[in-house]
């Protein structure tokens, strides 16, 4: 981490990766803030960015001081359709725009305390699971993208996708911004929920415009690396290149099925015995 107050021009994400740097991200916001009483289990939505900005800011700062090079906006499940899902009505009470704007402002404030970049993130949507059209789903992503562009995030992440088709739509929507795009799927070695292999998922994401591809959230570090290896092999076989990314779950999941930890009987409140300690 750069010294606090260092104001040198920051290198972009691709400049860092192309030079051989290993870039460390942050993560785990939803679970960490749920345990601290700021996120409601079930909806897992990020209205705390508006209602409790000091809590979100503090967690960003903890990641920065631990060595993170990227502050990811706390916009997981911050699409308009998700914010009004499951009776939570955040979109009605606050508005998706305010949640996304607040998350961007907090991430930038903390990133500028060091040499960190800000990544604006979108994730899977209820619209896709409700079988809405590609046009309708992309519209949801573009609503968040408008805020990310207004707040001038450094790059974009499409994360936590169980279906590669939706992930491709997200990448295509984000790529129109002209900013670098990373894409991660919450899959294991068996692939996405339609049976598309990790290698093919990676190929489709890169062809859609992602410069960085990988996995996140549903499986532990060991299984996540196995899956990333399959992605790498798929890209090599297709003659494609991309940087690789892994944001594993911080719980051991050797006995999980295709959907990872969410299928465990311990999910979500009894996972502590599975914690992957330092």
From Swiss-Prot:
GO terms for biological process: amino-acid betaine catabolic process; L-methionine salvage; methylation. GO terms for molecular function: betaine-homocysteine S-methyltransferase activity; zinc ion binding. The keyword Iron-sulfur does not apply. GO terms for cellular component: cytosol; nucleus. Residues 11-278 form the Hcy-binding domain. Keywords: Cytoplasm, Metal-binding, Methyltransferase, Nucleus, Transferase, Zinc. It is found in: Cytoplasm, Cytosol; Nucleus. The modification N6-succinyllysine is found at residues 40, 93, 98, 232, 241. Its EC number is 2.1.1.5. Pathway: Amine and polyamine degradation; betaine degradation; sarcosine from betaine: step 1/2; Amino-acid biosynthesis; L-methionine biosynthesis via de novo pathway; L-methionine from L-homocysteine (BhmT route): step 1/1. It catalyses: L-homocysteine + glycine betaine = N,N-dimethylglycine + L-methionine. Found exclusively in liver and kidney. Zn(2+) binds at residue 217. Binds 1 zinc ion per subunit. Its cofactor is Zn(2+). Its main location: cytoplasm. Inhibited by dimethylglycine and methylthioacetate. Pfam families: S-methyl_trans. InterPro entries: Betaine-hCys_S-MeTrfase_BHMT, BHMT, HCY_dom, HCY_dom_sf. Homotetramer. This is Betaine--homocysteine S-methyltransferase 1. It comes from Sus scrofa (Pig). The lineage of its organism: Eukaryota, Metazoa, Chordata, Craniata, Vertebrata.
